[in-house]
Amino acid sequence: HRSLTHAYSAKTKEEHEVWKKSLRDRLWEITGMNKCVYCEPDAQYLRTDRINDLIAEYWGIKTEPEIEMPFYLLRPEQQNPDCKQKKHPILIVPHGHGGGKESTIQSQTKFIRDALEDGFLVVCPDERGSGDRREFPEQGEEPEKIRMNSHRELLQVCIGFGQSVIGMAVWDLMRLADYLLALSESNGFLACAGMSGGGQQTVWFSAMDDRVKAAITSGYFYGFKESLIELPQNCACNFVPHMFETADMGELGALIAPRPFFVESGEKDGLNGKSGLNNVTTQLDVTRKAYHIFNENTYPIHSIHSGGHQWVGTGMRTFLIKAMEKE
């Protein structure tokens, strides 16, 4: 399984940069991101909602000429009128499976509230096929419908065009970053954090875009063989043509080096695969090779909790604060 076209083998910074460009170019192609079409965001404010006592502005941007991405924008000064900060770091929190942007705020309220207290603009978007972007078979406001996604339908169609669900998701996050970093209230620091499918989006987005200055993934960092090839019942968004010939999770992590990177794992998380945490740590060992080339020994941070497939969050707030100080 390690006979990969882009297995990590760099020994110097120069070799790392050559490898990084080569793998990114290959991922740009096999994910179908090269088929996406750029357009201006044409941002639209729609309304303001209150979720778990947090004030959330509902916005939308265009990520392709006929593709719209809705997101919630939460501002520190709306939660705390005493906030005098004029420029803010930005934290994108992609959702996992089982809901959209609303579920992010509902399930990660403390993390989001802490980030707002620390001055972040917090942004919770809908991924293609989820939330307000579900295709017609899954549309509806019933709880069971809201928890569904259309990733299988999307993959079945987009694979015929040489595209993938994760490729489209990363493209959308890149276009969202374009818009957010251009805001007058942005201070230029961008972080991304997600659980499960949100962790997947975070890892891939951070691997493909150096503008992400700090990345947090929970419940998504493990070797592909045990967690995807041997567990093919996982969501269709995990699968990219030729990926299993190209690179493994450790290589995706190496693309993030030397930026601050935080991985949270549950001891009992079944998605880790049959060897459990060993399927996580062996991939992190690959990632650490890249960090060591840059003499970076602090990252990646690996936080392990005793639970299953769940977000715990211990140490994440401190991680983000230190990452900002590093900049």
Segment roles from a protein language model:
Residues E185-S196:
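Alpha/beta-hydrolase fold nucleophile elbow
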Residues R152-E153, V157-Q163, R175, V212-A254, ...:
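Mobile cap/lid helix-loop segments that gate and shape the active-site cleft of serine hydrolases
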Residues L173, G199-D210:
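Short glycine-enriched nucleophile-adjacent loop
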Residues D285-E327:
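C-terminal catalytic histidine-bearing segment of alpha/beta-hydrolase fold enzymes
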Residues E29-K86:
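N-terminal cap/lid segment of alpha/beta-hydrolase-fold proteins
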Residues K84-K87, I92-A182, E226-E230:
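Cap/lid segment of the alpha/beta-hydrolase catalytic domain
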Residues A257-G276, S306:
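Conserved strand-to-loop "acid loop" that flanks and positions the catalytic carboxylate
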Residues V165, S196-Q200:
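Active-site loop->helix "elbow" adjoining a glycine-rich segment at hydrolase catalytic centers
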